[in-house]
Amino acid sequence: MKQTKIVASISDRRCDQDFIRKLFFAGMNVVRMNTAHATEEGIRTIVKNVRAVSPHIGIMIDTKGPEVRTTGVKEPINYNVGDVVKIFGRPEMESSHDIVNVSYPDIAADVKVGDDLLFDDGELDMKIIDSQGPMLVAEVQNEGVLGAHKSVNVPGEHIDLPALTEKDRRNIELAIELDIDFIAHSFVRNAADVKAVQDILDAHNSDIKIISKIENQEGVDNIDEIIDACYGIMVARGDLGIEVPIERIPGIQRRIISKCVKAQKPVIVATQMLHTMIKNPRPTRAEVTDIANAIFYRTDALMLSGETASGKYPVEAVQTMARIAEQAEKDKSPLNDIDPMEDGKIDQKLFLAHAAIEATKKLGVAGIITDGETGQTARDLAAFRGPNPVLAICYKEKLQRWLNLSYGIIPIHQKDQVSTKAMFTAAVRMLRQKGYLGEEDKIAYLSGSFGEGGGTTFVEINKVKKIFDNSYSFNLPSNGIEDK
């Protein structure tokens, strides 16, 4: 069973329960919805169908974030190298061959002569050669076609847009109403952008978790404060590869993953993981290696976009990613391990989590069980990327969905506040029935004071047989994995 988590994007054009169930059984842990391509009705349908399939699948919704786009066109415009174009920030006016209008009124104030304007995810490049008040003059650098409402990127420049659009605010309120688990905030530049979302959540007393999408140089530069401000990070390599030189992407990805592991925050690697499988049943060797390398870097999760949202082989894409992940987890080298305590940050709970993981390596402990209200102990354990599964008993139903982004964690919702002994015994029995444990195997139990905020205070190690010999019959509820 893979330990790396999989996020799969789903469109409202293909979101029936049978389809979602197939993705779930193939290895999907979290459903992601892109609000740029979904209506409110579509979002409601996706959420309803996901919850009908299983209450254990996490749901993530994107914001649009601070982005610039071109305006409408009567028909696609063809450009040749050397064409000269005037550019204005007039969102209410259509664009033509000679005049391109964009959605941001102050575009001319935020860029300078010599900057490149990249349209349509970098497909068309225009270099600014003159600036005259509200008008920019640009020269086309490559042949290309410009359609309606295409993205506009200006690598290296700060575009002074608000963190949230009105549509974003409406979608966040919809996410609160539907009790969605994660908001993936696009184009996060600093901690203030995260706070803009958090303020809305706080005003509605919502516990939705924020995932910050790193898609520009500002986000990379301010990554430490962004990590501190949010639940997790997504390395969104699509726009990031436009905003920064593409050869820097692997190094940025590696450094962000390392920082997230040290902070015990979930990290997702996204974009073009299996892009070939949008149209073809098999991936390229480069894509297989890309997925494996993300796991070798120690990512928590991987994300599929068009592969599952609109591709011809969505289920096969998830199955393929799961197989690659499982093999990469076996092949990863300890030389690439990241120590969350290497910067001198040692507290009791992190120390005990490290001790439990070391026990799996040096004492032959076959599995770890923990419980809690917040999931922090489980995330501490995930940060050490141990070789064996961690069963996390969750006292909140939403907690098991939040932990669907944490490496190696099998979350189980425990409704009843039974005794610690009963809960522990039932967890061992579940792992035994799933084939993770044998009678002579050792198991570690990480726990502490009961109730939220109590903290981790002890590690117990015992043999499975001895636990069963000294216990009564207890059972944990299903989390859906028994049927896989």
Predicted regions and their residues:
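Non-catalytic helical/linker scaffolds that mediate oligomerization, partner binding
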Residues: M1-K484
